């Protein structure tokens, strides 16, 4: 599923991401934009053999199990396939675990490079939330 910007913002808000660990909703919407272009089915292969999955491009080396990543940890305790569902509940649950890990949203390269330090409120502007 490819979400509309405001549709995604509303879903993320409903699932408790607004100000989760101090990160406003705009940060999460911005991260999703630049990680997956709001597409739940996005996947990207990394040079280390791991793969990033879903709307927030969650990595199989640490966070989920795809059955093909050497030395995978599966900290979120989920198959990576659930991160590709239209329903983002599991992706959000895992993202909460990731952002609680010490590096905050710096875990997402696209967030660090394109959202951090910018006016992320623009990502939720005009949305009925």
Curated annotation (Swiss-Prot):
<feature type="domain" description="C-type lysozyme">
    <location>
        <begin position="1"/>
        <end position="129"/>
    </location>
</feature>
<keyword id="KW-0964">Secreted</keyword>
<dbReference type="Pfam" id="PF00062">
    <property type="entry name" value="Lys"/>
</dbReference>
<dbReference type="InterPro" id="IPR019799">
    <property type="entry name" value="Glyco_hydro_22_CS"/>
</dbReference>
<comment type="similarity">
    <text>Belongs to the glycosyl hydrolase 22 family.</text>
</comment>
<dbReference type="InterPro" id="IPR023346">
    <property type="entry name" value="Lysozyme-like_dom_sf"/>
</dbReference>
<feature type="disulfide bond">
    <location>
        <begin position="64"/>
        <end position="80"/>
    </location>
</feature>
<dbReference type="InterPro" id="IPR001916">
    <property type="entry name" value="Glyco_hydro_22"/>
</dbReference>
<keyword id="KW-0929">Antimicrobial</keyword>
<keyword id="KW-0378">Hydrolase</keyword>
<feature type="active site">
    <location>
        <position position="52"/>
    </location>
</feature>
<dbReference type="InterPro" id="IPR000974">
    <property type="entry name" value="Glyco_hydro_22_lys"/>
</dbReference>
<dbReference type="GO" id="GO:0003796">
    <property type="term" value="F:lysozyme activity"/>
</dbReference>
<protein>
    <recommendedName>
        <fullName>Lysozyme C</fullName>
        <ecNumber>3.2.1.17</ecNumber>
    </recommendedName>
</protein>
<dbReference type="GO" id="GO:0005576">
    <property type="term" value="C:extracellular region"/>
</dbReference>
<keyword id="KW-0326">Glycosidase</keyword>
<keyword id="KW-0081">Bacteriolytic enzyme</keyword>
<feature type="active site">
    <location>
        <position position="35"/>
    </location>
</feature>
<feature type="disulfide bond">
    <location>
        <begin position="6"/>
        <end position="127"/>
    </location>
</feature>
<feature type="disulfide bond">
    <location>
        <begin position="30"/>
        <end position="115"/>
    </location>
</feature>
<dbReference type="GO" id="GO:0050829">
    <property type="term" value="P:defense response to Gram-negative bacterium"/>
</dbReference>
<comment type="function">
    <text>Lysozymes have primarily a bacteriolytic function; those in tissues and body fluids are associated with the monocyte-macrophage system and enhance the activity of immunoagents.</text>
</comment>
<dbReference type="GO" id="GO:0031640">
    <property type="term" value="P:killing of cells of another organism"/>
</dbReference>
<feature type="disulfide bond">
    <location>
        <begin position="76"/>
        <end position="94"/>
    </location>
</feature>
<dbReference type="GO" id="GO:0050830">
    <property type="term" value="P:defense response to Gram-positive bacterium"/>
</dbReference>
<comment type="subunit">
    <text>Monomer.</text>
</comment>
<keyword id="KW-1015">Disulfide bond</keyword>
């Amino acid at each position: 599923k490819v979400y509309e910007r405001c549709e995604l913002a509303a879903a993320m808000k409903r699932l408790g991401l607004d100000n989760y660990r101090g990160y406003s909703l705009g940060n999460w919407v911005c991260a999703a934009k630049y990680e997956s272009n709001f597409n739940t089915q996005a996947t990207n292969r990394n040079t280390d053999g791991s793969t990033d999955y879903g709307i927030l491009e969650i990595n199989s080396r640490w966070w989920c199990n795809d059955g093909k990543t050497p030395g995978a940890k599966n900290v979120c305790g989920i198959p990576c396939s659930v991160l590709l569902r239209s329903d983002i509940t599991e992706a959000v649950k895992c993202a909460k675990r990731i952002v609680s890990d010490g590096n905050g949203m710096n875990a997402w390269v696209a967030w660090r490079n394109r959202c951090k330090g910018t006016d992320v409120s623009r990502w939720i502007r005009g949305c009925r939330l």
